[in-house]
C-alpha cells in the first residue's frame, strides 16, 4: 500500500509513525526540509515546497500512490487535493473550496451566520481601512468589548493579535488593522472580532462528508513563555486526559462542542458539497459555553502528536474510511491514557529565532525515558541537524496520569541540546489548576 505524505514537520512525523504501524504501508514523502525521522520511515523522499503543485504532481506520477495524506494547511489552500483527485488519487484532506473553513476566516464566520450555528460571536470583515472599520471598533469599545484583529487568510498561526495581550487597547487594534492592509499580510483583508473571555481547548474530528468521529479533547499552549506570557506561537505543547475531556469542562460543554462541529459539517455539505479529512475546532470555553475561535482543515500541531499516540485503530483504516465515506461503519477508539507534548524551540522564537544553529538530540536517551520523539523544523545535512527557525523538536509522554506523562516529556527535553528553550510548565498541575480556577470564576 503506497501512501503519499505531504509535509515535513512534527505533525507529519506523528502521521508517518501512525501509518507505519501497519506493515503493509510504504511511505513516500514530499517535504520542504529533510526531516530525519520522516526520512527514516519513508521509502523515498522528495525535497520541495509543499505548495509547489508541479512538484507534487511530478512526484505523484512517479510514485503512483494508492492514497495521499496532507499534513499542513498551505497546500490545502492551494488546491493540492483537487489536483490529486484529478489524477485519480484519493486524498485525506478537503478540496480547496472546503478548505476555506481555515484559509478564509470570513467564509467561516459567514457560514456560522448563514446556517445559524451555535457558538458564533460579533465580527465584521473589511477590505480597506476606513471609517467603517474604526466605527465598528468604537462600537466594541462602547460595549466594553476588547477587539481581536485577524488577517482573513493564512499567516501560519502568527497574524492574530488580541487587545489585552499583544495590543494595548482598541486604538492600538486600529493601528494593527491598518498595518495588515499596508503589508498585505494574509491576503490583506481584515476580520475584527469580539474578544472572548474564557479558557481555550481544541477538538478534532475525522470527517467523510457525512459522518464525524471525534477524538479526545486537547489543550494547546500558544504563548511562548511560561505562565502563558509572551508572543503567540504555533503552539508550545499540549496535553490530554485519560477520560478524554479536560478538567475544566462539564458534560454539557462536551456535548455542545460536538454539536457545533456536527452542525458545521452539515453546513459545509450544503455550502460546498461536503468536507472530508480532519476538522479541528479551536474553541473558547466561556461562561455561556463553548464558542468557536477558528477552524483548521487539518490536524493541529502539536495536538496530532497527543492524539495519534493513543489512537487504538489502524490509522490507515481510518484514512480509508474517510475517503470511502465509510466512517459510520467503524468505531474510532483511543486509549484511556494521558498525554503531554512539549516543543523544544530555537532561542528567540517566534519573533526573532536563531536560524541555522546546530541542535543535538540523544535519541537513545530519549527512548529510555519512554517518550516519543518527533523532529519538526530541522534540516539534516551530512549527518548533522540544524534548526530552520521554527519549532525544532517535540517530545510526547504517554501514561496513566497527566503527572506521569508530564514527567516523561520533561525528562526527555534534557537530551535535546543547542540554542533552545521549552515551556516546562505545560502539563504541570499548577497551570491546569489555574485553568480550572479561571473557569470557576467565570461561571460564578
Curated annotation (Swiss-Prot):
Its EC number is 6.3.4.13. InterPro entries: ATP-grasp, ATP_grasp_subdomain_1, PreATP-grasp_dom_sf, PRibGlycinamid_synth_ATP-grasp, PRibGlycinamide_synth, PRibGlycinamide_synth_C-dom, PRibGlycinamide_synth_C_sf, PRibGlycinamide_synth_CS. It is an enzyme of class 6 (ligase). Mg(2+) 1 binds at residues 282, 294. The keyword Cytoplasm does not apply. ATP binds at residues 140-202. Mg(2+) 2 binds at residues 294, 296. Belongs to the GARS family. NCBIfam families: purD. HAMAP family: GARS. This is Phosphoribosylamine--glycine ligase. The lineage of its organism: Archaea, Methanobacteriati, Methanobacteriota, Methanomada group, Methanococci.
